[in-house]
Amino acid sequence: MTFPGTRTRTILHESDQYYATTTMDSRILAASGDNAIITDPDGNTFIDLHCGAGVNNLGMNNPHIIAAIQAQLQTGIIHAEHHNAPNPLAIELSLMLAATCPVRKPSKVFLSNSGAEANEAARKLCEAYRYHAGEKHVRSRAIYFENGFAGRTHGVLAATTSNPSVQRDPYWNHYDQENSIYLPYPTKANANLLRKKLSDLDLSAVDRLLIELPCQGEAGIIPADEETLEYLYGVTRSAGILWIVDSIQCGIGRVGTIFGCDLYPWLEPDILTLAKALGGGLPIGATIFRADLDWKKGEHSNTFGGNPVSSRVALTVLACVQELIASGAIKRIEQAMQKRLYLLRDHPMVQDMRGIGAMWAVELPDTRLRDRLIDIGEEMGQTETYGLKLLGAGRKSIRLMPPLTISPKDLTIALDLFLAALNTLRDENENDSLSS
């Protein structure tokens, strides 16, 4: 088949004309989907290897999610005024999250519509807590991490540093730079530098720390080093700094656990944020926090948080992911990916591989080659049964995050196609070198 086809080209043209300029790059348009397989408006098929940056962890057209949506629609309640009176499904979801998450107990939950909103709520909780404690002028600083990503709304732009020239620089009044501290992410390579920078800080002036765990996603799937992380935790904890853990891309089974940071039994966040896969494709965000950090009445609220459809689906997602974890399915995906990707270690187009659970990155020599690999993957369906839906991460990496429900056969096909795409890229690059 031709890619992009006639219908796809028409929609892409209309998008350029009528939709705002955002981050859209892919030419793969989803007309229908089934687990890991996407079909576009022209009938081309693709294997999804990034799940909408970790949203569709249970794949597309998941029967459990479809059934949950249908069951809620049959009640006639699509919107409940959860800001005005409790919605039973939102309370059930909150109870489950509060009871099982690693946040210090007792804990509470605030539901919203996205990861950015979840992180905004986390920031507001910390600031309100310091305000009521009479510490707003004493603890006014915040620790963030280089190459981090916390969302695109104004309040969390200070913590979003993965591509500041486009994410932050146009919004010149976006944060108080003097009160934002940027540390290297706690990897083994950064351990000594991180210790040095921590020793130079007046930690008594710091309100909060926001960190993605167990790895940075948008930065290029950068796993934290546990020893370095534990040192950071100990030093900042003893200084009274509030810990916000962002498990938005890493959570809901992606690294083999529900909350991502529960890989570290010694870590007890004050606040934990979730979104993406929690909603099974529907908008949702969750901010789980120590109960004593709670707002005073009226200090924070929203219109659509605790939506009954999203809440019912989230309960279903949590149950399904628990089953996948218990069955060893996610571990098998991790082992299969490790085994196949290890064979690429000497490939001329591969500079590095890293990951955890079902969340991996392959780093290429530069951004141009990475972007060309994405195009090659999309175009493979013209000669193969499937093309590949790939997504970049960081400056020059590809993230590989298949659905946690992907069949062994489809995963094998996808990894075979990925190797073929790398080989095509290698051949193109060699030909370019010869011609120049």
What is the role of each PLM region?
Residues 1-436:
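Conserved N-terminal phosphate-binding loop of PLP-dependent enzymes in the Aspartate aminotransferase
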